[in-house]
Design a protein with these regions (language model features):
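Short helix/loop segments within enzyme catalytic domains
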Residues: 151-187
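Active-site recognition of the HExxH zinc-binding catalytic motif
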Residues: 44, 113-126, 156-157
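Short pre-active-site segment immediately N-terminal to the catalytic Zn-binding motif
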Residues: 96-114, 147-148
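Catalytic zinc-binding patch centered on the HExxH motif and its immediate surroundings
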Residues: 65-92
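Acidic helix-start/capping segments at beta-turn-to-alpha-helix junctions
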Residues: 20-29, 33-42, 49-72, 139
């Protein structure tokens, strides 16, 4: 599909400083998410504007299971999601505390990758790709819904990796943090996934690698790629 975001140029590096907090309380998680969202807004705004679209900021909320959102009740399976109804990104802050059990680096990088992905959905919403996705989804039924879902999700992750590649230095994505990024960026519909709606680990790895290197949404037109899992 054609969209001006693909020719809008690279995502810029920004002065991105996130607090080195332990992600075990709602207050700490909200502080971390707020700081990182600010980085995402400042980096993506000029790209979206160059695509000919007015930039609208997102919001981010650290919530727990059972919380009411503009897109319904936040459930156990949700982990994190973008809600187009209020341009809100919702995170299960208690789950991030569980990630701290795997190590502080793992918890922080998981949050960065997930937040960058969800903000990728915000970019899709702003530039009209989400409307295109809704149209494609409405043209099919049953399991055929999975293909447009995979393309949509892979693209959001790809946009996230374009930002992370551009901001590798300010986010210190080197050494153990870079290895943690590679692990998270490769995560997909591992067998036996109940629904193959986010793309295979191989597809996620390939799109992430291309975007991280290119630092540009030009590397992320998943809609014209050959069909894959």
């Amino acid at each position: 599909m054609r969209n001006r975001i693909y020719s809008a140029g690279q995502v810029p590096a920004v002065a991105c400083v996130v607090p080195d907090v332990v992600l075990r309380s709602q207050k700490a998680v909200q502080r971390y998410l707020n700081a990182f969202q600010d980085c995402l807004q400042r980096a993506w705004k000029p790209v979206v504007v160059r695509a000919g679209v007015r930039f609208r900021p997102s919001a981010v909320y650290a919530v727990r299971q059972g919380s009411k959102t503009a897109c319904g009740t936040f459930a156990e399976k949700d982990h994190a999601y973008y809600c187009p109804a209020d341009s809100g990104i919702y995170f299960d802050w208690e789950e991030l505390g569980q990630w701290e059990d795997y190590g502080h680096v793992a918890a922080q990088v998981y949050t960065l990758v997930t937040m960058a992905h969800e903000f990728g959905h915000h970019v899709q919403e702003l530039v009209g790709i989400s409307t295109y996705y809704d149209d494609r989804w409405g043209e099919v039924a049953g399991s055929a819904h999975l293909e447009p879902m995979r393309r949509h999700e892979l693209q959001a992750s790809c946009f996230g990796s374009a930002f992370l590649g551009a901001n590798q230095t300010p986010l210190d994505l080197y050494g153990a943090r870079y290895e943690a990024y590679l692990s998270e960026a490769s995560y997909g519909d591992h067998p036996p996934a109940t629904a193959r709606d986010h793309g295979s680990p191989q597809s996620n790895t390939e799109w992430a690698a291309a975007a991280f290197t290119a630092m540009s949404p030009a590397a992320c037109n998943t809609w014209v790629a050959p069909r894959a899992g």
